[in-house]
Design a protein with these regions (language model features):
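Conserved N-terminal alpha-helix of the aminotransferase class I/II PLP-enzyme fold
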Residues: 58-106, 128-133, 139
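Conserved PLP-anchoring active-site segment centered on the Schiff-base-forming lysine
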Residues: 116-134, 163
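Active-site C-terminal subdomain of aminotransferase-like
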Residues: 154, 180, 187-190, 195, ...
Length: 390
């Protein structure tokens, strides 16, 4: 298979074929049975901008996993690959004393970290659009902890909002009848594609330390945040300002995996117990270590992140040039244009994206999401079709 080959899932089988954007029924590497199926069923190969985890993994990761496949290593993250990845992450974060753990997915990681920090009567403060509040099926609440939401500003929380929640609770004479704020959760980049700037993170961190509330940063899309044109933070800044955060792999080139970085030593005791209790202690833990070793070799993590952001910003610029309003000032890989329903219908026979909110009659906010693997040719096609439809 060539470098640009991928797997296309048909309703009946999984076969290696040319990517959808380059599909040709005459291509010699497409089995005739698939060609016949496409012709008889009018199967359309869609270009997917729905999310940033539709593809598998970067070829370097797959190659490294194959090369190490027959190695015999200890389980549960105690192998040499995980240890090497820990050392690499400590170095790039300028956090030599950080405790680093590898988990499989974002919801599992959020649930494990939050449950490790909070007492049974405490909750976690986050904005209304926070992932733990709206897209985790009550995972945090299932542990007995309330998610205390506040209205964010462009998807972001502020020190003032944090202090308001804290004061409202502790100034109440009947405070023991209510859930006590116990920590703060933020995302970088946010769920709406915006980023926290260094002065914002410093102010939030200072407020959290003043109120003795641990600060947890969800980094599922951290690479995309670091690659944003207006970003002025580094991994070292985040490690310095947050009690705990994680570096997302699932959405940025890995098959799966999130690297939790704990900088507050009070969180460390018992954390592996919590990982195990939440089903996150992977027996073949080396699969996680190898992926993060590879992502942080030769700046691959940031190369992949920059590619996704560059493609998203091409789309944003094209939309702005046509006078399309965008719901958020996103500088990352997620863009939220407000489009006429007629345009959405016109595009829907070729493109997949998410509908986020129906606004005024005939107008809908959608999410267009690029990834580390988005083909520039597919962005060209989308821009061309948008130009024709608008």
């Amino acid at each position: 298979m060539g470098r640009d080959s991928s797997f296309w899932l048909s309703p009946v089988f999984l076969l290696p074929v040319t990517p959808p954007g380059n599909f040709s029924s005459k291509d010699s590497n497409i089995p005739q049975i698939l060609t016949n199926f496409a012709e008889t069923s009018n199967l359309a190969f869609m270009i997917n901008f729905e999310c940033d985890y539709t593809e598998g993994a970067h070829a370097s990761i797959l190659q490294r996993l194959a090369e190490t496949n027959m190695e015999q290593t200890p389980g549960y993250g105690k192998d040499r690959h995980c240890e090497n990845a820990r050392q690499i992450i400590r170095r790039v974060c300028n956090a030599p004393d950080a405790d680093v753990h590898f988990l499989v997915g974002g919801t599992q990681t959020n649930k494990t970290v939050i449950a490790s920090i909070l007492r049974p009567y405490q909750g976690v403060i986050c904005v209304e659009t926070g992932h733990i509040a709206v897209h985790e099926t009550g995972a945090i609440e299932s542990t007995g902890h309330k998610v205390i939401t506040v209205p964010g500003i462009n998807g972001k929380i502020t020190p003032q909002l944090i202090e308001q929640v804290y004061r409202r609770h502790f100034d109440d004479k009947g405070l023991e009848h209510c859930v006590q704020p116990g920590m703060v959760y933020i995302s970088q980049s946010t769920e709406v594609g915006t980023v926290y700037h260094l002065n914002e993170l410093e102010a939030i961190s200072a407020m959290c330390r003043k109120l003795e509330l641990p600060l947890f940063l969800d980094g599922a899309r951290l690479g995309y945040g670091l690659a944003a044109s207006d970003n002025d933070t580094s991994l070292a800044d985040i490690a310095r300002l947050c009690d705990v955060f994680y570096i997302g792999g699932t959405k940025i080139g890995a098959l799966f995996g999130e690297a939790v970085v704990i900088n507050n030593p009070s969180i460390t005791p018992g954390f592996r117990y919590m990982i195990k209790q939440n089903g996150g202690l992977l027996a073949k833990g080396r699969l996680l270590g190898i992926q993060f070793e590879t992502l942080f070799e030769n700046d691959l993590y940031m190369q992949l992140s920059r590619h996704a952001v560059e493609q998203a910003m091409r789309i944003r610029c094209a939309l702005e040039a046509k006078g399309v309003a965008l719901a958020y000032a996103s500088t990352t890989n997620q863009q939220f244009p407000i489009l006429p329903d007629s345009v959405i219908e016109h595009l829907s026979d070729r493109y997949i994206f998410s509908t986020t909110e129906h606004l005024t009659p005939g107008m809908t906010e959608v999410r267009i999401c690029t990834s580390w693997a988005t083909l520039s040719e597919n962005v060209d096609r989308l821009i061309d079709d948008l130009d024709k439809a608008l």
